[in-house]
Amino acid sequence: NLGFSEGCADSLYLPVDPSDDAPTVESQEQDENSLLHMVRRILAFRHEHEDLQADGEYEVLYAEKEKAPFVYRRGKFVIAVNPSLETAVAPVKVQGTEAFRIGGGAQVDKDCLKVAPQSFVIYEL
């Protein structure tokens, strides 16, 4: 299982990548920009802040069916997610500092938030 699990390949939720250049735990550990390190950073950030715990309340600030971005507030944080391949704009006013990002982040313009393609950003208010 390339070092990610000790379980049988048949019992895993997702199949093991069969390619010769498939990522291994060892290769991911050595690459600070790897998916493994990214997941560890975001989990550490989440655990540092009570507002981001699983039982935290949230308020949707912007959401449209089949349209990005999705923007919501949890306590003192505003979180914006854009999984699309295009820059997405939400009519949301954000006054805070960027606390965490994955991807290209976002840009605050007057009364809107422009989120880069395939990006995730957290602002601390």
Question: What feature does the model see in each segment?
Answer:
Residues 7, 96-99, 125:
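Intrinsic disorder/low-complexity segments enriched in polar/small residues
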